[in-house]
Protein backbone atom coordinates (compact mmCIF):
# COMPACT_ATOMS: atom_id res chain seq x y z
CA UNK A 1 0.00 0.00 0.00
CA UNK A 2 1.34 3.39 -0.99
CA UNK A 3 1.15 6.25 1.48
CA UNK A 4 1.99 9.89 0.85
CA UNK A 5 2.52 13.05 2.84
CA UNK A 6 1.88 16.60 1.63
CA UNK A 7 2.96 19.86 3.26
CA UNK A 8 3.78 23.45 2.33
CA UNK A 9 6.69 25.79 2.81
CA UNK A 10 6.32 29.53 2.41
CA UNK A 11 2.60 30.10 2.89
CA UNK A 12 3.12 33.18 5.06
CA UNK A 13 6.08 35.13 3.61
CA UNK A 14 5.55 38.43 1.81
CA UNK A 15 8.52 37.73 -0.47
CA UNK A 16 9.20 34.71 -2.66
CA UNK A 17 7.33 31.63 -3.86
CA UNK A 18 5.40 29.00 -1.99
CA UNK A 19 6.36 25.34 -2.40
CA UNK A 20 4.11 22.34 -1.81
CA UNK A 21 5.99 19.09 -1.31
CA UNK A 22 4.69 15.56 -1.67
CA UNK A 23 6.45 12.30 -0.83
CA UNK A 24 5.17 8.79 -1.63
CA UNK A 25 6.52 5.58 -0.12
CA UNK A 26 5.40 1.96 0.28
CA UNK A 27 3.88 1.68 3.77
CA UNK A 28 6.03 -1.35 4.64
CA UNK A 29 9.14 0.75 3.95
CA UNK A 30 7.97 3.97 5.62
CA UNK A 31 9.97 3.19 8.79
CA UNK A 32 13.10 4.13 6.84
CA UNK A 33 12.06 7.78 7.17
CA UNK A 34 12.35 7.49 10.96
CA UNK A 35 15.70 5.72 10.58
CA UNK A 36 16.94 8.62 8.45
CA UNK A 37 16.02 11.01 11.26
CA UNK A 38 13.20 12.78 9.45
CA UNK A 39 11.53 15.30 11.77
CA UNK A 40 9.54 18.53 11.64
CA UNK A 41 11.51 20.68 9.15
CA UNK A 42 11.27 23.76 11.39
CA UNK A 43 13.31 21.94 14.07
CA UNK A 44 16.17 21.10 11.70
CA UNK A 45 19.15 23.18 10.61
CA UNK A 46 19.30 24.16 6.91
CA UNK A 47 22.29 21.84 6.40
CA UNK A 48 20.48 18.89 8.01
CA UNK A 49 17.39 19.58 5.90
CA UNK A 50 19.48 19.52 2.72
CA UNK A 51 21.09 16.21 3.70
CA UNK A 52 17.73 14.67 4.54
CA UNK A 53 16.06 15.98 1.37
CA UNK A 54 18.66 14.14 -0.70
CA UNK A 55 18.10 10.90 1.26
CA UNK A 56 14.31 11.24 1.12
CA UNK A 57 14.35 11.58 -2.67
CA UNK A 58 16.64 8.55 -2.90
CA UNK A 59 14.43 6.26 -0.79
CA UNK A 60 10.96 7.51 -1.75
CA UNK A 61 8.84 5.75 -4.38
CA UNK A 62 7.87 9.16 -5.68
CA UNK A 63 8.06 12.85 -4.85
CA UNK A 64 6.84 16.10 -6.34
CA UNK A 65 7.31 19.79 -5.53
CA UNK A 66 4.84 22.38 -6.80
CA UNK A 67 6.18 25.94 -7.01
CA UNK A 68 3.77 28.89 -6.93
CA UNK A 69 5.12 32.35 -7.73
CA UNK A 70 4.12 35.56 -5.89
CA UNK A 71 2.27 36.72 -9.04
CA UNK A 72 0.26 33.48 -9.18
CA UNK A 73 -0.63 33.81 -5.50
CA UNK A 74 -1.73 37.43 -6.01
CA UNK A 75 -3.92 36.50 -8.99
CA UNK A 76 -5.61 33.64 -7.13
CA UNK A 77 -6.18 35.79 -4.04
CA UNK A 78 -8.36 38.11 -6.13
CA UNK A 79 -10.96 35.34 -6.40
CA UNK A 80 -10.35 33.03 -3.43
CA UNK A 81 -8.92 32.71 0.08
CA UNK A 82 -5.47 31.41 0.92
CA UNK A 83 -7.05 28.24 2.32
CA UNK A 84 -8.78 27.62 -1.02
CA UNK A 85 -5.47 28.14 -2.82
CA UNK A 86 -3.90 25.53 -0.54
CA UNK A 87 -6.63 23.01 -1.43
CA UNK A 88 -5.95 23.47 -5.16
CA UNK A 89 -2.18 23.18 -4.68
CA UNK A 90 -2.39 20.09 -2.47
CA UNK A 91 -4.72 18.47 -5.04
CA UNK A 92 -2.19 19.16 -7.82
CA UNK A 93 0.51 17.37 -5.83
CA UNK A 94 -1.91 14.52 -5.10
CA UNK A 95 -2.54 14.16 -8.84
CA UNK A 96 1.16 13.45 -9.35
CA UNK A 97 1.46 10.86 -6.57
CA UNK A 98 -1.90 9.01 -6.50
CA UNK A 99 -1.29 7.07 -3.24
CA UNK A 100 -3.74 4.79 -1.42
CA UNK A 101 -3.55 6.93 1.73
CA UNK A 102 -2.49 10.56 1.97
CA UNK A 103 -1.58 12.43 5.15
CA UNK A 104 -1.93 16.18 4.70
CA UNK A 105 -1.04 19.06 6.97
CA UNK A 106 -4.37 20.88 7.39
CA UNK A 107 -4.38 24.42 5.97
CA UNK A 108 -7.73 25.20 7.59
CA UNK A 109 -8.87 25.75 11.19
CA UNK A 110 -11.09 22.69 10.64
CA UNK A 111 -8.90 19.76 9.59
CA UNK A 112 -11.88 17.63 8.54
CA UNK A 113 -13.15 20.38 6.25
CA UNK A 114 -9.73 20.62 4.61
CA UNK A 115 -9.81 16.86 3.92
CA UNK A 116 -13.31 17.12 2.41
CA UNK A 117 -12.35 20.07 0.22
CA UNK A 118 -9.17 18.31 -0.89
CA UNK A 119 -11.14 15.22 -1.91
CA UNK A 120 -13.67 17.37 -3.79
CA UNK A 121 -10.91 19.22 -5.66
CA UNK A 122 -9.02 16.01 -6.45
CA UNK A 123 -12.23 14.44 -7.78
CA UNK A 124 -12.35 17.06 -10.55
CA UNK A 125 -9.42 15.37 -12.30
CA UNK A 126 -9.42 11.90 -10.69
CA UNK A 127 -13.08 11.05 -9.86
CA UNK A 128 -12.63 7.28 -9.54
CA UNK A 129 -9.52 7.45 -7.35
CA UNK A 130 -11.01 10.26 -5.24
CA UNK A 131 -13.71 7.82 -4.07
CA UNK A 132 -11.16 5.22 -2.96
CA UNK A 133 -8.31 7.27 -1.53
CA UNK A 134 -8.10 7.71 2.25
CA UNK A 135 -7.35 11.32 3.17
CA UNK A 136 -6.12 12.04 6.68
CA UNK A 137 -5.79 15.74 7.41
CA UNK A 138 -4.41 17.01 10.72
CA UNK A 139 -2.95 20.16 12.19
CA UNK A 140 0.82 19.91 12.69
CA UNK A 141 0.82 16.64 10.75
CA UNK A 142 4.51 17.27 9.99
CA UNK A 143 5.25 16.71 13.69
CA UNK A 144 3.17 13.49 13.80
CA UNK A 145 3.71 11.60 10.54
CA UNK A 146 7.27 11.10 9.20
CA UNK A 147 5.96 11.00 5.61
CA UNK A 148 4.53 14.51 6.09
CA UNK A 149 7.79 15.62 7.73
CA UNK A 150 9.58 14.32 4.63
CA UNK A 151 7.26 16.35 2.38
CA UNK A 152 7.83 19.42 4.54
CA UNK A 153 11.60 19.00 4.30
CA UNK A 154 11.79 18.75 0.50
CA UNK A 155 9.42 21.72 0.15
CA UNK A 156 11.43 23.84 2.60
CA UNK A 157 14.76 22.98 0.97
CA UNK A 158 13.41 23.89 -2.47
CA UNK A 159 11.98 27.19 -1.23
CA UNK A 160 15.29 28.05 0.44
CA UNK A 161 17.07 27.36 -2.87
CA UNK A 162 14.66 29.64 -4.72
CA UNK A 163 15.08 32.40 -2.12
CA UNK A 164 18.87 32.27 -2.53
CA UNK A 165 18.46 32.40 -6.33
CA UNK A 166 16.24 35.49 -5.98
CA UNK A 167 18.77 37.22 -3.71
CA UNK A 168 21.57 36.60 -6.21
CA UNK A 169 19.51 37.56 -9.25
CA UNK A 170 18.25 40.80 -7.71
CA UNK A 171 21.45 41.51 -5.72
CA UNK A 172 19.43 42.11 -2.57
CA UNK A 173 19.24 40.68 0.93
CA UNK A 174 15.74 40.84 2.38
CA UNK A 175 16.25 38.32 5.18
CA UNK A 176 13.75 35.47 5.46
CA UNK A 177 10.95 37.15 3.52
CA UNK A 178 8.51 36.80 6.43
CA UNK A 179 6.49 39.89 7.48
CA UNK A 180 7.76 39.58 11.07
CA UNK A 181 11.41 39.77 9.98
CA UNK A 182 12.80 43.32 10.62
CA UNK A 183 15.24 42.84 7.71
CA UNK A 184 12.35 42.02 5.37
CA UNK A 185 10.37 45.05 6.55
CA UNK A 186 13.39 47.32 6.16
CA UNK A 187 13.97 46.05 2.61
CA UNK A 188 10.34 46.63 1.61
CA UNK A 189 10.27 50.12 3.12
CA UNK A 190 13.53 51.10 1.38
CA UNK A 191 12.38 49.66 -1.96
CA UNK A 192 8.99 51.37 -1.67
CA UNK A 193 10.62 54.74 -0.96
CA UNK A 194 12.99 54.40 -3.91
CA UNK A 195 10.36 53.13 -6.37
CA UNK A 196 7.35 55.34 -5.60
CA UNK A 197 5.44 52.66 -3.67
CA UNK A 198 5.87 50.02 -6.37
CA UNK A 199 7.32 46.61 -5.58
CA UNK A 200 9.10 43.98 -7.72
CA UNK A 201 7.65 40.66 -8.91
CA UNK A 202 9.34 38.80 -6.05
CA UNK A 203 6.91 40.49 -3.63
CA UNK A 204 3.36 39.30 -2.92
CA UNK A 205 1.43 42.48 -3.68
CA UNK A 206 -1.75 41.19 -2.01
CA UNK A 207 -0.14 40.92 1.43
CA UNK A 208 -1.29 43.32 4.14
CA UNK A 209 2.36 44.11 4.91
CA UNK A 210 2.75 45.69 1.46
CA UNK A 211 -0.48 47.65 1.84
CA UNK A 212 0.65 48.94 5.24
CA UNK A 213 3.97 50.15 3.78
CA UNK A 214 2.19 51.88 0.89
CA UNK A 215 -0.07 53.68 3.38
CA UNK A 216 2.94 54.62 5.50
CA UNK A 217 4.74 56.07 2.46
CA UNK A 218 1.62 57.92 1.37
CA UNK A 219 1.23 59.54 4.80
CA UNK A 220 4.91 60.49 4.86
CA UNK A 221 4.58 62.05 1.40
CA UNK A 222 1.67 64.24 2.50
CA UNK A 223 3.59 65.75 5.41
Swiss-Prot record:
Domain of life: Archaea
Entries under SUPFAM superfamilies matching the protein: Ribonuclease H-like (SSF53098)
Binding of a divalent metal cation, residues: 7-8, 105
The protein's required cofactors: Mn(2+); Mg(2+)
Keywords noted in UniProt: Cytoplasm, Endonuclease, Hydrolase, Manganese, Metal-binding, Nuclease
UniProt GO cellular component terms: cytoplasm; ribonuclease H2 complex
Catalytic activity entry: Endonucleolytic cleavage to 5'-phosphomonoester
EC number: 3.1.26.4
Domain RNase H type-2: 1-219
Signal peptide annotation: none
Cofactor binding remark: Manganese or magnesium. Binds 1 divalent metal ion per monomer in the absence of substrate. May bind a second metal ion after substrate binding.
GO biological process: DNA replication, removal of RNA primer; mismatch repair
TM regions (residue ranges): none
Cellular compartment(s): Cytoplasm
Entries under Pfam families matching the protein: RNase_HII
GO molecular function: manganese ion binding; RNA binding; RNA-DNA hybrid ribonuclease activity
General function of this protein: Endonuclease that specifically degrades the RNA of RNA-DNA hybrids.
NCBIfam families on file: ribonuclease HII
Family stated for the protein in its record: Belongs to the RNase HII family.
Protein name: Ribonuclease HII
Species whose genome carries this gene: Methanosarcina acetivorans (strain ATCC 35395 / DSM 2834 / JCM 12185 / C2A)
